Amino acid sequence: MPLRSLFHTNQSSHDKDALTRGGYNAYLESLSRCDSGKAEEQKGKVISKLLEKKDVRALRYIGLGPLGFVNNSLRKDCWYELLASQLLIDDATEYITPVEKHKDEGQVILDAERSFGGIVDKNLKLQLRKLLVELITRVLRKYPTLNYYQGYHDIVSVFIMCFSWNVTKENGLELENLSLQEEIDMERLFYCIEAFTLLYLRDFMMNSLDFSFEQLRVISSLIKESNMKFYNLFKFDENEPLFAIGSILTIFAHNLKPIDSGDNNLHKILFQIFDMTISMQSMRLPLIIYKNLLLQNASEISKQIEANSDFFENDFDLRHGAIQTVLQKKLYDEALWEEVLQITRKDATTASKKALKRVSLNKYSALLNTACGKPGCFDMSTIIFYLSEQTKMNEHYKEEKYHGVAARSKTRALVQRLGHFLPSKYNRWSKISLLIGIVAILYQLRTTRSLSLVLNLRYMISTKLKDLSHININLHHVSHIWVDPIRDILKLGHPTR
């Protein structure tokens, strides 16, 4: 399926445009035959014309192709036009009651102090960090139901570097006299960060990782669809791809930080990943990229697993360790990344919907609406509704998990206490009768919550255990501990008829 079919381009309105119809594919293919400098120059001219015409549909397609939006001077304008077409925000409207200070601001400051480590100039580094804190804080205060997560600052850093690149790299300004905020279009920058956060990152900005883990499971499902042999070798049905959490939460910004001097090729790779994600309006795309990154290294990962199988006690550690070892070595392999992105461009639009259907996603996930790969425009009332429902669902998940852990903890404590009265070995039937008694206790406590019941249960259990506590009893020869535990317990609290 050609990519342009996703964008529903009105071909009749562009009959004279050289980039329409089949011209898109032919044009992008011709660029691949040019040397990189000439290709960047040619594509840059095309993007400039599309920006002049505000041709968002064409920009979407161009952004998916090789070189993305070419350079940050063009990229910042392309990102703004695309994100502004995806989300309508009225600055005069207060969608959620803001707060004066968000609970996560302390962590934001700590993470900002570790950011932009590759920037040599101290004044510039200080200004970048200050800007990072200001932008993140502004988002959090405006939408206080969002929760900051470690990694969000990496994503915001990408937008900052994109918008400030010309100021710090090309204009030759004296850095000691530089006022970054005066040189950057701050309102456009904030709009991009705000829109990207609300459209693409909602799943990650809850106060638990449940929705984030749901997205990781999509990677397993995509691998199952693409390479069943590797899926079985890694045992993805048993081992969740938790190793991918850092890459997905930051859309690879943590792996390929744009903070060193010069516009090197790895920075271009990172910016192209964002170009593709925004152009396709899809948070599925980073998951597909990660899947392709794994499969391109499947052979080496398999060898690593085989070579180290004797050194790990469990499959989970073995397989996760193998993947981390291989990917860490390949992290700065430019040729590998180029190959992965090219494969992704070909299969991003054909990745089967079955891969998503096999994963239980919350129904308000960005993967299913605002960043599902189908370009569309959303109003803020819809976004606030999604955010509100996801927040409620997240709290429900947490509550269920808490009660589940609490119940398991109470059961474990009860069994441990019983163990103090019993030798380590005893008759099998004694064991079964005692277990049945415990189950009956839990059932009765769940259905009847009266103090008298608790006291009666306490008396009954203590009596049973007292009978077993005499040191001369040999439990190997005891035929039973509790003859009829269900009858004894369930009749408690019920009047005799």
Curated annotation (Swiss-Prot):
The lineage of its organism: Eukaryota, Fungi, Dikarya, Ascomycota, Saccharomycotina. The keyword Signal does not apply. It comes from the Eukaryota. Present with 573 molecules/cell in log phase SD medium. One of its GO terms (biological process) is vesicle-mediated transport. Residues 69-281 form the Rab-GAP TBC domain. InterPro entries: Rab-GAP-TBC_dom, Rab-GAP_TBC_sf, TBC20/Gyp8-like. It holds the Pfam family RabGAP-TBC. The gene is GYP8. GO terms for molecular function: GTPase activator activity. One of its GO terms (cellular component) is cytoplasm. Keywords: GTPase activation. The keyword Ubl conjugation does not apply. This is GTPase-activating protein GYP8.
